Amino acid sequence: MISVPAAAEDFNPRKIYSETSRAVVLITGFEPGQRKMSKGTGSIISSDGFVLTNAHVIIDKNKGQPFNNLRIFLKPDRISGDLRKDTSLKYRAELVRFSENLDLALLRIRSPSISNLFPILEFSDSDLVSIGDPVIAIGHPEQGGLWTLTTGTISSHINNYGNIPGKNVFQTETS
């Protein structure tokens, strides 16, 4: 999930969701002929179709390698609750790079026609985030709906999480 920090006085979950949810994507990874599939959330971070996600979303745990087939689903104009309708905007994805240690993966949507059509989630300065700041998360919980919204607060900041240099994380009460 992607969490978007917001100043407390500007914290309007409905407005933030309306302005950013189209830059949130559903990602699936699978192997031909297998029923098991990985599912997770990603964020479009550039107008030419680069998507940031977690490495565990694109790794086949049985093989310890990235899935050969990666798909990205874009958010429809309106979420219906019907899986087929809500996942009709499907594109192939190319794995650009990943780090299992940092649990990050960079994908690229394989369709030039989507450039500049969707909002981009922009990065901001993480040094401006403080414990107690409100956040929202938009994503696809394992046993939940698609493009869901949850709110919470930053509860902790952890540097070098898991003793991995550079893996700095915020703990939130969002899910």
Where would I find each of the regions flagged by the language model?
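Active-site-proximal beta-strands of protease catalytic cores
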Residues: 23-28, 50-55, 128-141, 172-175
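Extracellular/periplasmic catalytic domains that process cell-envelope and extracellular macromolecules
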Residues: 16-20, 44-45, 85-87, 97-101, ...
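Beta-strand/loop subdomains of soluble extracytoplasmic proteins
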Residues: 69, 82-94, 131-134, 147-159
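Active-site substrate-binding loop(s) of clan PA
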Residues: 16, 61, 94-96, 112-145
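Solvent-exposed loop/turn segments at secondary-structure junctions
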Residues: 31-34, 51, 57-59, 100-102, ...
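N-terminal activation segment of mature serine protease catalytic domains
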Residues: 4-55, 94, 102-105
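Active-site region of chymotrypsin-like
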Residues: 20-35, 110-120, 147-175
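Catalytic-histidine neighborhood of serine endopeptidases
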Residues: 46-101, 111
